Amino acid sequence: MKNSDDSGYTGKHVGVCVLDTGIFPHIDFTGRILAFQDFIGHRIRPYDDNSHGTHVCGIIGGDGRASEGRIKGIAPGCSLIVLKVLDRTGNGRKEDVLQAFRWILENKRYYGIRVVNISVGTTCRRAEDHRVLIAGVEQLWDAGLVVVAAAGNQGPKARKCDSTGKQPEDYHSRLQRSAYRTDCHIRQGTYL
């Protein structure tokens, strides 16, 4: 993102926890990956066998070192806490996501976590599975964390945010970012 630091906000002293496929220790994250927890392969060192997690972390907190400051994330000074909940194909299990939520609640103070980015969607069909995941997100919000969640790629029809078919107002506690496709163009939803 160009000119993200024009506002003066850099994310310094803000811990951003990213749930995704992991993180590659790229030069743009030097000294700012505070923690890495692997709920899939249980490895110790940061890695990303898919690249989606690294991409998301770059959008959030890349500091532009590799591009000599030309391309940065939206919070180039933030600390990154990365929880790998998706495998190399981008798939994951509800149980791993819920375990990651518990980890965040147990460690938020230690790592200074203030924002949680959940870059996962769901193809769950059972309403109970959705209720459990939404309850977990609500717990994070109730603990004082800002939760930013992907709207998902599985929306059943235009203007729906996720695979449950819930409208944005059904999720009062999380911020959603989404786009939808119409006539081969990607557009931001009008409800944002």
Residue ranges of predicted features:
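Substrate-binding/access-modulating region of protease and related hydrolase catalytic domains
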Residues: 85-169, 175, 179-182
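Short, well-ordered turn and helix-capping elements at secondary-structure junctions
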Residues: 2, 43, 63, 122, ...
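Short, solvent-exposed loop/turn and secondary-structure capping segments
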Residues: 26-31, 160, 183-185
